[in-house]
Amino acid sequence: MWFASIWIFTLRLPWELGAAFFYEHLLDGDVASNTLSWRWVAGLQTPGKTYVARADNIAFYTDGLHAPEAGRLASVPIAIREEPLPKVALWTEDQAQLTSLKTFERIGLWVHPEDLAVETGELADLNIQAVNAVWPHAIRARSGWSEKVTAWTQAALEDGATRAGKHFGAKVSSGEAADLAASLVEWAKSNRLQAVVAYRPFVGPWLAEALALGATLASVGIALVWRRRTWDTEHFPHATRGYFPFWERINAAG
């Protein structure tokens, strides 16, 4: 928050550039938490409520390692305004698809970095015949990740795919592909799959990749079934304001 506050209010730089800088360099950068954190500091997420870094606070919590001189940091936030963001419909699972999934004998699993614990949860008991963890070559350019972030994410993907392969007793396909959809089709056909299942990515670069997969697989008669973890399905409807109202609603719901 110190960094974001200094960036926005002292240096007077656009918060969007700061968020992009963080997302480019943070190894575990997350589209949602990164964006929301910067918006909150700027006074946009909770309109009118800003976070302004103080020199004494920085000096105290860094044990004097960083002690900005008096008057160097902005003490009054600048007013940032924007047009209201459009409402986005909450995605929900297709119950007909979930029913049809039970009828398939040969199912493949697509693993991506947004959920690398597929050996637990809703997919854990499926009879998976093959696991795919192919890396789309162009995603780094589209996401703006640094080389270190890309390498770290690729290593995490390999680790998650290896665990998935061991859990399901299935062969893992990895490597890079220029066209993820075409690569998945070739993989699915070679493994005689009737369906491919995956946790649906959230808004961000992996969802952008995922949206093209369904139609491409369907064109060769292979179903793509999206899942979402139960806790996300149950909690998302409560995420309409800040953290504390969200927490209170979850507690009230039991």
What kind of feature is each model-predicted range?
Residues E24-L27, S33-N34, L85-G254:
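Trp/Phe/Arg-rich N-terminal binding region typifying the photolyase-homology
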Residues M1-A96, L101-R106:
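Active-site-proximal binding-pocket segments
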